[in-house]
Each structure stands twice: as structure tokens, then as C-alpha cells.
């Protein structure tokens, strides 16, 4: 039974291939949002990831019979999911990088920008999720309406994708403007950091100069103290020499007088101790 349904589906798709190409070909014409997307592809990694997401969708739409087989399988949904995950990962990384660069900015401003970027990021994610759900819905409708015109289903999907792409690029433009709006804050924060760094360098330079001056003053005071100490030593030595010159004669005279006194005492003692002559001799 499944083989019969598959054969019937292939026959219907083969018969509608000519009409399908007429429906798809206008989609390949340049659109304003596609020009914007081409410009954005030279920007941030998250913009490149989102561009790959829409490039993949446009490639799917350019297929004829093969696209139906792909849509009836889960390959397209899985690949779109992978592209969505890649885009959201790049968005989160870009948001984290912005928050890190805005660290010197006031907490209130940083919180507001973070909230706005998170809201824009959520809208982009919702847009891509809507694309995936509509592809799943289209696949279900193809499976349920094999007896109806597949051209109508293709046209509906093409219209939905065109509208979703327009809305998505509108949200992307909002996200990009909000991210660019934070750049002046980043520049001001960098300028503020540069001024602070310059100010700290000036303060450090003045402090080093002041320390050098204090060091020179300390060296000068130390030299003066050493000079004064030397002068005091010389004065003390001179005073000691004068004292010595004053007292040496007096001491010598006292020593001579003491020596003379000792001699006299010794002579007196010696005379008194001499023996008296005897009458028997």
C-alpha cells in the first residue's frame, strides 16, 4: 500500500513539476531583504549563521521533485534544527561578548541593553522555530492531501517562507541596531578606561618623582648629619687635647711632690731605725 501511495505521489509531482518551477522561480529574484542579508553576511558570526539558515531554505525551494521527497523525510527538519542551533549559539556568544565589553558601564544601562538583546534574540529564535513548524505542517499536509493539488501547497509554503523571511530580517535589523547602539557605550567605556589608565600613570609618575625628591632630601639630611657628627668628634678630640694639656703639668707636679714626700718619710723612718753605739767598745 505504501508503495502505491509513493508511486501516486511521484506521478502527481512529476505532472506538477512545470507549474512548480513557475512558482519557485520568482522566489529567486533579488529582494530587498536578500540584499540586506548579503550585506550582513560580512558581519558577525551569528549573522553568517542566520544567513546559512536562509540560504538552506532557498536551496530547498529551488528543488522540484526531490524537494518533496526531502520534505517527506526528516532530513530537512534535522538540518534546519542544526542551523537554528548554530545561529542561536552564535547569538548567545555575541551577547556574552557585548556584556563583557560593557562591564565598565553602569549596571542599569548594561541590564537594559542585555534585556533588549535577549528579547531580539528570542524573536529571531521564534521566527526560525516558526519556519521549522511550518515545514513540518507542510509535510503533514502533503502526506494527508495526496489527492489534492500539490501546487497549491507549494505556493502556500513559498508565501509563508517569504513572509517569515521578511519578518525575520526585520527582527534581525532590530537586533543589529540594538547591538550597534551599544557600540557608543563600548567606545565611551574604552575612552573612560583609557582616561583612567592615563590618570593612574600620571599619578604614578608624580608619586615616583615625589619619592625621588624625598629620597634626595633624606640623602641630603643624612650627609648633613654625618658632617655635623664629624665636626662634633673633632671638637671633642680638640677639647680632650686641651684638657690633657691643662692637667698634665699639674699631675706631674703632684707626682713629683708625692715622690719627694715619700722619700722624706722613708729617710726619717730609716734614721730612727739605726742602732745606738755601745760604751763597751
From Swiss-Prot:
Superkingdom to which the source organism belongs: Eukaryota
Post-translational modification: APOE exists as multiple glycosylated and sialylated glycoforms within cells and in plasma. The extent of glycosylation and sialylation are tissue and context specific.
GO cellular component: chylomicron remnant; endoplasmic reticulum; extracellular exosome; extracellular matrix; extracellular space; glutamatergic synapse; Golgi apparatus; high-density lipoprotein particle
Record InterPro entries: ApoA_E, Apolipoprotein_A1/A4/E
UniProt xrefs under SUPFAM superfamilies: Apolipoprotein A-I
Residue windows of the Sequence repeats: 82-103, 104-125, 126-147, 148-169, 198-219
Region (Homooligomerization): 230-281
GO molecular function terms attached to this record: amyloid-beta binding; antioxidant activity; cholesterol transfer activity; enzyme binding; heparan sulfate proteoglycan binding; heparin binding; identical protein binding; lipoprotein particle binding
Subcellular location: Secreted; Secreted, Extracellular space; Secreted, Extracellular space, Extracellular matrix; Extracellular vesicle
Record's subunit section: Homotetramer. May interact with ABCA1; functionally associated with ABCA1 in the biogenesis of HDLs. May interact with APP/A4 amyloid-beta peptide; the interaction is extremely stable in vitro but its physiological significance is unclear. May interact with MAPT. May interact with MAP2. In the cerebrospinal fluid, interacts with secreted SORL1. Interacts with PMEL; this allows the loading of PMEL luminal fragment on ILVs to induce fibril nucleation.
Identification of the protein by name: Apolipoprotein E
Gene: APOE
Amino acid at each position: 500500500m505504501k508503495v502505491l501511495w509513493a508511486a501516486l505521489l511521484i506521478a502527481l509531482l512529476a505532472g506538477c513539476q512545470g507549474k512548480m518551477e513557475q512558482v519557485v522561480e520568482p522566489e529567486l529574484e533579488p529582494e530587498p531583504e536578500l540584499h540586506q542579508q548579503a550585506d550582513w553576511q560580512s558581519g558577525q558570526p551569528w549573522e553568517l549563521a542566520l544567513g546559512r539558515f536562509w540560504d538552506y531554505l532557498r536551496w530547498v525551494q529551488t528543488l522540484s521533485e526531490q524537494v518533496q521527497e526531502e520534505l517527506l523525510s526528516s532530513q530537512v527538519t534535522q538540518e534546519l534544527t542544526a542551523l537554528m542551533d548554530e545561529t542561536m549559539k552564535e547569538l548567545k556568544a555575541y551577547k556574552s561578548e557585548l556584556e563583557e565589553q560593557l562591564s565598565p558601564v553602569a549596571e542599569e544601562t548594561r541590564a537594559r541593553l542585555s534585556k533588549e538583546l535577549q528579547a531580539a534574540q528570542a524573536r529571531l529564535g521564534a521566527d526560525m522555530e516558526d519556519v521549522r513548524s511550518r515545514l513540518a505542517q507542510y509535510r503533514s499536509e502533503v502526506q494527508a492531501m495526496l489527492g489534492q493539488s500539490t501546487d497549491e501547497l507549494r505556493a502556500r509554503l513559498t508565501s509563508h517562507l517569504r513572509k517569515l523571511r521578511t519578518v525575520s530580517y526585520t527582527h534581525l535589523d532590530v537586533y543589529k541596531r540594538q547591538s550597534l547602539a551599544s557600540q557608543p557605550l563600548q567606545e565611551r567605556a574604552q575612552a573612560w578606561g583609557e582616561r583612567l589608565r592615563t590618570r593612574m600613570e600620571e599619578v604614578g609618575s608624580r608619586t615616583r618623582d615625589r619619592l625621588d625628591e624625598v629620597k634626595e632630601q633624606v640623602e641630603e639630611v643624612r650627609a648633613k648629619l654625618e658632617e655635623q657628627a664629624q665636626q662634633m668628634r673633632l671638637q671633642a678630640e680638640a677639647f680632650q687635647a686641651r684638657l690633657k694639656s691643662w692637667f698634665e703639668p699639674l699631675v706631674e707636679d703632684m707626682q713629683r711632690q708625692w715622690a719627694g714626700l715619700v722619700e722624706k718619710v722613708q729617710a726619717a723612718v730609716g734614721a730612727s731605725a739605726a742602732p745606738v753605739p755601745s760604751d763597751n767598745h
